[in-house]
Amino acid sequence: MYSIVKEIIVDPYKRLKWGFIPVKRQVEDLPDDLNSTEIVTISNSIQSHETAENFITTTSEKDQLHFETSSYSEHKDNVNVTRSYEYRDEADRPWWRFFDEQEYRINEKERSHNKWYSWFKQGTSFKEKKLLIKLDVLLAFYSCIAYWVKYLDTVNINNAYVSGMKEDLGFQGNDLVHTQVMYTVGNIIFQLPFLIYLNKLPLNYVLPSLDLCWSLLTVGAAYVNSVPHLKAIRFFIGAFEAPSYLAYQYLFGSFYKHDEMVRRSAFYYLGQYIGILSAGGIQSAVYSSLNGVNGLEGWRWNFIIDAIVSVVVGLIGFYSLPGDPYNCYSIFLTDDEIRLARKRLKENQTGKSDFETKVFDIKLWKTIFSDWKIYILTLWNIFCWNDSNVSSGAYLLWLKSLKRYSIPKLNQLSMITPGLGMVYLMLTGIIADKLHSRWFAIIFTQVFNIIGNSILAAWDVAEGAKWFAFMLQCFGWAMAPVLYSWQNDICRRDAQTRAITLVTMNIMAQSSTAWISVLVWKTEEAPRYLKGFTFTACSAFCLSIWTFVVLYFYKRDERNNAKKNGIVLYNSKHGVEKPTSKDVETLSVSDEK
């Protein structure tokens, strides 16, 4: 019992400066850690002229795959590292292997360690499980709570609109959509600095500080007396929330491996649905119990309560967010756990964040803009940001148009779709991670998304069909954790490239919603929204098709790096014989140089 108290209370307190400020942890890699990456160790072993013993460990007659393990000993440092290679003959490779997303990413032996019913990969050590559990609490769980309050502050305007704000402030015509756009514009503009600084700043300081700032602005929204004042407040709320979405996605890519990331990102997205769900419940409770208290309408109290919750969560963030493995500020991770997190990055071939290199490197930018990633992924994300009708508030506006529900009942009914969305989200995350098929997870969600929006575009259907269609609306967003996690994996080899691509694709995609929403989601057309539902269905279809383009380029990159993933390729049909272990060793040394 004492050891537990010491690890979660006593030791963390000792790591605080002046008893309340988390500071950067100074943790040096041990010699064993520095030599634990397989290729470096193999290279050193060969250069030391140590002997190598090669032997067959696994043979799959079905696929004619061979595994060989080379064991190298370096007596100087007492390091013994084993690396397994799969020797794969690509002669007569069937066409359907194109759909095997992990064909060149992980070898068959590693695949055998993945069990769909287990949260951890088979063979994960106790220390690594402990680290992952800590990260799940400190990063994944906290990010969920942070996204929850962020979304409370984002969508509360829709609940306020149907709870009396429209009449109190004199909303007319398209004022609602214009107010929503002001938030988006502020959010986009203030993402631009993070194009350069996302991987250069201690995010454990930045994110909570911005949380506190937008909390104060949310209080201000409770006291506005005109639509222009509300628009100004929403602009600055969007500005202070600008980096949060990007930053959490970046942090997931800094700690988790490719087949762990989607579930954690999906857990983060749960905060979005909890925010939508609880916004209706909170507004319903507030309107019923606080409407008129101290002369304030119920919708104004809603903003105040949202702000109070945001302040509390922001303060917790200073102590919960861990930074990243090479710039770690966590008071809860031990030195050995920080080293283990770094080792996991090396195993996943993830480039480390570096606060010390120069901010603007023209060579790096040329490399980024001459590569496929920034263009293909940006267009992909534009389809993603426009493939849902949730943010339009169409469901709530349709319910209100029926003129049969009281305001508290409207807010209660608004909780149904995000509740279902949470189920869709976790199901999609499990499909992507545990079945090792992110493309299938995306297609799975978009089939239902297209069906729902097509029904709503038709509109002249039975009321039950409309209920069914609106119940499917959260399938549109369910694939977003998959997309962002996949982007992290695609760009994993260089941290700055990963950050720049992430910010660029997000800015461009979110920018598209700022003007598209004005064109297709005009408030005066509610709740019919013919253009909106039609455009959303088309975006979902384009997203599905473009996912296969991403899959093609992703697999091409992974094939070029197959050996680093433990897969040695050859084609006997073209007269290329199976390489020997010595050939692979020589190539490993060559690659390292």
UniProtKB/Swiss-Prot annotation:
Source organism superkingdom: Eukaryota
Keywords: Membrane, Transmembrane, Transmembrane helix, Transport
CDD domains assigned to the protein according to its UniProt record, in alphabetical order: MFS_FEN2_like
GO cellular component, one term: membrane
A GO MF term: transmembrane transporter activity
Cytoplasmic compartment spans: 1-130, 197-200, 256-265, 324-363, 433-438, 488-499, 554-593
InterPro entries, sorted: MFS, MFS_trans_sf
Record-level GO BP terms: transmembrane transport
Family: Belongs to the major facilitator superfamily. Allantoate permease family.
Protein name: Probable transporter SEO1
Lineage: Eukaryota, Fungi, Dikarya, Ascomycota, Saccharomycotina
Gene: SEO1
